[in-house]
């Protein structure tokens, strides 16, 4: 039995779950999410918890058991609390601005980099150097954050670039030269 897959998912108040075959819809105060489950895995609602069960012990069913449980748990957490990623911009003259759904990054290129945010994603900027990406879908929040970081990843000599706020960038010593 999958250690992750057999753990029950608690359903918070104000969250409703609609299960129709392999289709799961979760609605909460922050919004609603839908997902089609993979084959050989079922979700069962018991009182105020969800249980993910597999049909048999085949390899594919065991592979998908823990994955499905985590995906459904992320849906429940997303519609109740939401997800947030923080990115820090470091470097002289590097800054970010938000105009509606557009994020503009000035990170040392000849022209500013403009990014349009997908639906359901909110972006905020604090002090021109801290970008906060938030939304209800953990996968989209992570992908958008990775795209923003990829515009100018942190470099190892001076540490300039865009990094996650909790990321540690390993620094390298530069050339020492002849003496």
From Swiss-Prot:
GO MF annotation list: rRNA binding; structural constituent of ribosome
Protein's recorded name: Large ribosomal subunit protein uL6
InterPro entries: Ribosomal_uL6-like, Ribosomal_uL6-like_a/b-dom_sf, Ribosomal_uL6_a/b-dom, Ribosomal_uL6_bac-type, Ribosomal_uL6_CS
PROSITE patterns: RIBOSOMAL_L6_1 (PS00525)
Keyword Ribosomal protein: yes
Key words of the record: Ribonucleoprotein, Ribosomal protein, RNA-binding, rRNA-binding
Family of this protein: Belongs to the universal ribosomal protein uL6 family.
One cellular component (GO) term of this entry: cytosolic large ribosomal subunit
Keyword Cell wall biogenesis/degradation tagged: no
Assembly behavior: Part of the 50S ribosomal subunit.
GO biological process, one term: cytoplasmic translation
Stated role: This protein binds to the 23S rRNA, and is important in its secondary structure. It is located near the subunit interface in the base of the L7/L12 stalk, and near the tRNA binding site of the peptidyltransferase center.
